[in-house]
Each structure stands twice: as structure tokens, then as C-alpha cells.
Amino acid sequence: MENDAGENVDLYVPRKCSASNRIIHAKDHASVQLSIVVVDPETGRQTDGTKTYAICGEIRRMGESDDCIVRLAKKDGLITKNF
């Protein structure tokens, strides 16, 4: 869609599940979005960066959300590889 100024505007931008790449629909009320802060390993303080993970309701229904979050955090370097 375009607004009065001629700029492209989307009314709804769907999210994708970080674990399965499925589109999270507007009526998926079981989905969650987690924002995890990046911590400086030397000082233990929060930096300006965050990592955001969206988990769809289907993954949560199967009980796989905790495994998916650990796998994604390992891939992003938030958790050590031998965790």
C-alpha cells in the first residue's frame, strides 16, 4: 500500500519463527518473542546489543522450544558450544 506521500507502507509485517522459519500468523496466540541481552564476558555487564528469537506456537506445543532456544543461542555465541 502507499500513503498520501507516495511511500510504501505495510499494515502488517508477519514474523518468522527463528527455529523453523514458519510464518507466525496473527492468530497464533501461543507464539512468544524473547529478547536476550548480550553480556560483556569480562565485566559481566549488559552491552547495547540484543538477540531476539521468535518461537511459533507449533514448536511450543511439541515441547521443543527450550531445545530450539539453546540451539539458536549456541549458534549466535551466547552459550558456549559444550553447554
Swiss-Prot record:
Component of the 40S small ribosomal subunit. Interacts with sta. One of its GO terms (cellular component) is rough endoplasmic reticulum. The lineage of its organism: Eukaryota, Metazoa, Ecdysozoa, Arthropoda, Hexapoda. It comes from Drosophila grimshawi (Hawaiian fruit fly). InterPro entries: Ribosomal_eS21 (IPR001931), Ribosomal_eS21_CS (IPR018279), Ribosomal_eS21_sf (IPR038579). Belongs to the eukaryotic ribosomal protein eS21 family. It is found in: Cytoplasm, Cytosol; Cytoplasm; Rough endoplasmic reticulum. Keywords: Cytoplasm, Developmental protein, Endoplasmic reticulum, Ribonucleoprotein, Ribosomal protein, rRNA processing, Translation regulation. May be an associated component of the ribosome rather than a core structural subunit. May act as a translation initiation factor. Has a role in regulation of cell proliferation in the hematopoietic organs and the imaginal disks of larva. This is Small ribosomal subunit protein eS21.
